[in-house]
Amino acid sequence: MNNQSAKAVVKIQRISPRKARLVADLFRGKDVKVALGILNNTNKKASQLFIKLLNSAIANATNNHGMDASKLFVKEVLVNEGPTLKRYQPRSQGRAYSIFKRTSNLSITLEERV
């Protein structure tokens, strides 16, 4: 019995890791069809990013690894912090406030259910 896995990664997406993790927690460990259903009915920016990434991981599993798409489930969802864009907002009396535009690195790993 071999535990083959398929992976898809997207880096430097303009969404904060904290907001992306809210969506990632919704479908971790679920079957692929259930996960897509959850993401399609979630009204968050991160859900659209995860839909693209999940479809890419499914394509990798079926085309590159010869896995059965109906048996796939989401084994691992990682949301790591990417590089931060630092900007400044001018304020009164010569001050400036820092603005951090955070980015995320997203990763999904799929496996077949036995």
UniProtKB/Swiss-Prot annotation:
This protein binds specifically to 23S rRNA; its binding is stimulated by other ribosomal proteins, e.g. L4, L17, and L20. It is important during the early stages of 50S assembly. It makes multiple contacts with different domains of the 23S rRNA in the assembled 50S subunit and ribosome. The globular domain of the protein is located near the polypeptide exit tunnel on the outside of the subunit, while an extended beta-hairpin is found that lines the wall of the exit tunnel in the center of the 70S ribosome. Part of the 50S ribosomal subunit. Belongs to the universal ribosomal protein uL22 family. The gene is rplV. One of its GO terms (molecular function) is rRNA binding. This is Large ribosomal subunit protein uL22. Keywords: Ribonucleoprotein, Ribosomal protein, RNA-binding, rRNA-binding. One of its GO terms (biological process) is translation. It comes from the Bacteria. It holds the Pfam family Ribosomal_L22. GO terms for cellular component: cytosolic large ribosomal subunit. CDD domains: Ribosomal_L22 (cd00336).
